[in-house]
């Protein structure tokens, strides 16, 4: 039978051709054939990520198997609306205890008084805070893409879809963050209701206390987006945003935190969290995935026990890899500042035609990464940076001592030696043991 999906004129033609070819293949199969194909694809994904490749993309991680197993324990399909102790449905005695345990662990790990664990993504976590602090038509100030500012804070993302006007924050290019003095002048001019900090690449601590002073001076709230920094914050290897003045922290739970896909909001501001709670229920979340909540709780336990060691190892390993790549002659961004104080850093990617082109060269060697914006000259038709991170490889057992070898693989793959690098990466994966920094 022909595919039910039809061509979408608004999608790039090459992508849509690919989509429709997959749809046609699925439409031509019977039910058993589709089931077999899904199983095959799941196995193929496992091969790509877990048997033959190394993830250097800080936007992903590997889960504690005990946490991952909770996703298939029959929890997620049980509707769970309302507050523990007074749920709309009955039979939720176990699930509501899981919800409370997850929130308690989140509050412990992030040093907060309140935690909202029902959010299904980091983007929605940001939207909840936007809705709790602003009204459509209000102005916010957010980091621009040149310093890793995420789309959810801008016109094409949650902020714009909610009707907010985003003004890009002024940039401190050397520190890969905002310029606090210039921000103060801008805030007096545009009168924002919310100022955000944090993004898709974080190299050095952001000036959160100074930004809070700016926010207070114009009556704004301060949101710290820890989508990528959540693990570093949880492991106390990064300044604590709530202690430094952020009104709330939002995050994804599957990046450096190494949990299931989803979002999380923590705060010490009771009035703000009361508004966020009403947005979550009965507003936009209503019923949530209890399986994800259980997996999140199990993953947060890793941070309660091993968080400091894991975060410190990530920072040390990222710094070692950045220095090793510099020794290979590669253009590591922010050399004058020591490259990074976090779990991630970037290469200037113009030499390879841009970050996405460079990432495709790395993929030929079994090394998975992606592009990122940097406050340097643009690259026509591509992103000007290549983002690298170490959360997953550290959990797999890589240490700073392994970074010269990894840097050599990266350098060779970027110059066209992907085939030989891929063979060496596959062999190295066969010698890896169990995961580190997890509670078994």
UniProtKB/Swiss-Prot annotation:
GO cellular component term of the entry, any: cytoplasm
Family matches, as InterPro entries: PyrdxlP-dep_Trfase, PyrdxlP-dep_Trfase_major, PyrdxlP-dep_Trfase_small, Ser_HO-MeTrfase, Ser_HO-MeTrfase-like, SHMT-like_dom
One annotated GO molecular function: glycine hydroxymethyltransferase activity
Modified positions (N6-(pyridoxal phosphate)lysine) in chain numbering: 255
Catalysis: reaction(s): 2-methyl-L-serine = formaldehyde + L-alanine
GO biological process entries: glycine biosynthetic process from serine; tetrahydrofolate interconversion
Known cofactor(s): pyridoxal 5'-phosphate
One Pfam short name: SHMT
Superkingdom classification of source: Bacteria
Alphabetical UniProt keywords: Lyase, Pyridoxal phosphate
E.C. number: 4.1.2.-
Keyword hit for Transport: no
Top-level enzyme category: lyase
Family note: Belongs to the SHMT family. Alpha-methylserine aldolase subfamily.
Complex formation: Homodimer.
Role description: Catalyzes the reversible interconversion of alpha-methyl-L-serine to L-alanine and formaldehyde.
Protein name according to UniProt: Alpha-methylserine aldolase
Organism per entry: Variovorax paradoxus
């Amino acid at each position: 039978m022909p595919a039910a999906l039809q061509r979408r004129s608004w999608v790039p033609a090459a992508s849509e051709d690919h989509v429709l070819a997959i749809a046609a293949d699925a439409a031509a199969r019977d039910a058993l054939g589709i089931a077999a194909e899904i199983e095959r694809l799941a196995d193929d994904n496992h091969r790509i990520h877990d048997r033959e490749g190394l993830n250097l993309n800080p936007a992903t991680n590997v889960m504690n198997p005990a946490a991952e197993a909770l996703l298939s324990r029959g929890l997620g399909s049980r509707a769970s609306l309302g507050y523990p102790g007074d749920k709309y449905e009955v039979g939720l005695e176990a699930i509501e205890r899981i919800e409370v345990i997850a929130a308690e662990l989140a509050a412990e790990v992030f040093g907060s008084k309140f935690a909202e664990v029902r959010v299904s993504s980091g983007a929605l976590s940001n939207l909840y805070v936007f809705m709790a602090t602003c009204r459509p038509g209000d102005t916010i100030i957010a980091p621009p893409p040149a310093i890793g500012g995420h789309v959810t804070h801008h016109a094409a993302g949650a902020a714009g879809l909610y009707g907010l006007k985003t003004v890009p924050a002024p940039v401190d290019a050397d520190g890969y963050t905002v310029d606090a003095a210039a921000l103060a002048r801008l805030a007096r001019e545009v009168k924002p209701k919310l100022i955000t900090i944090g993004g898709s690449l974080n190299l050095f601590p952001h000036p959160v206390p100074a930004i809070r002073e700016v926010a207070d001076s114009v009556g704004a709230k301060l949101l710290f987006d820890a989508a990528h920094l959540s693990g570093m914050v949880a492991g106390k290897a990064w300044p604590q945003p709530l202690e430094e003045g952020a009104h709330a922290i939002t995050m994804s739970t599957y990046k450096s935190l190494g949990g299931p896909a989803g979002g999380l909001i923590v705060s010490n501001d009771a009035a703000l969290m009361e508004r966020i709670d009403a947005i979550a229920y009965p507003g936009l979340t209503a019923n949530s995935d209890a399986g994800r909540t259980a997996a999140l709780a199990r993953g947060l336990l890793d941070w309660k026990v091993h968080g400091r060691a894991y975060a410190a190892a990530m920072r040390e390993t990222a710094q070692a890899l950045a220095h090793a790549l510099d020794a290979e002659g590669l253009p590591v961004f922010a050399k004058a500042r020591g490259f990074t104080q976090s779990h991630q850093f970037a290469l200037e990617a113009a030499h390879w035609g841009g970050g996405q082109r460079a990432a495709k060269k790395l993929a030929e060697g079994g090394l998975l990464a992606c592009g990122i914006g940097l406050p340097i000259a643009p690259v026509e038709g591509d992103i000007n940076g290549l983002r690298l991170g170490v959360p997953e490889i550290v959990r797999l057992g890589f240490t700073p001592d392994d970074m010269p070898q990894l840097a050599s693989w990266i350098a060779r793959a970027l110059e066209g030696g992907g085939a030989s690098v891929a063979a060496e990466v596959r062999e190295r994966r066969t010698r890896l043991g169990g995961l580190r920094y997890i509670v078994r």
